C-alpha cells in the first residue's frame, strides 16, 4: 500500500491487543478494547507555521506510538485498518 499523509498527519497501523489474558482466558472480539498502540508507517512533511516555516515532525517511520482512543480517522486498505492521526494526537513514543 502506498499512502503519503499531508502536513502534520501520520499513518499508524494499530497493534492488535492480545487475544488471551495473562491468566489464560480467551478474550472474544466483542470484549476487546480498541487498540491505542501502533507502528508508524508514513509521516507527512510537517506542520505549516504562521511565519511560513514548516515544523518537522518528531515522529519517524517505524516508531511505536500510543495515541488517544478516539483520535484520528480510520482508513481501511487491502483488508488492513490504519489510523490517520495528527502529530498532536500522538501521546508518547514507546521505546
Curated annotation (Swiss-Prot):
It is found in: Cytoplasm. It holds the Pfam family Cpn10. InterPro entries: Chaperonin_GroES, Chaperonin_GroES_sf, Chaprnonin_Cpn10_CS, GroES-like_sf. Belongs to the GroES chaperonin family. Heptamer of 7 subunits arranged in a ring. Interacts with the chaperonin GroEL. PANTHER family: 10 KDA HEAT SHOCK PROTEIN, CO-CHAPERONIN GROES. Together with the chaperonin GroEL, plays an essential role in assisting protein folding. The GroEL-GroES system forms a nano-cage that allows encapsulation of the non-native substrate proteins and provides a physical environment optimized to promote and accelerate protein folding. GroES binds to the apical surface of the GroEL ring, thereby capping the opening of the GroEL channel. This is Co-chaperonin GroES.
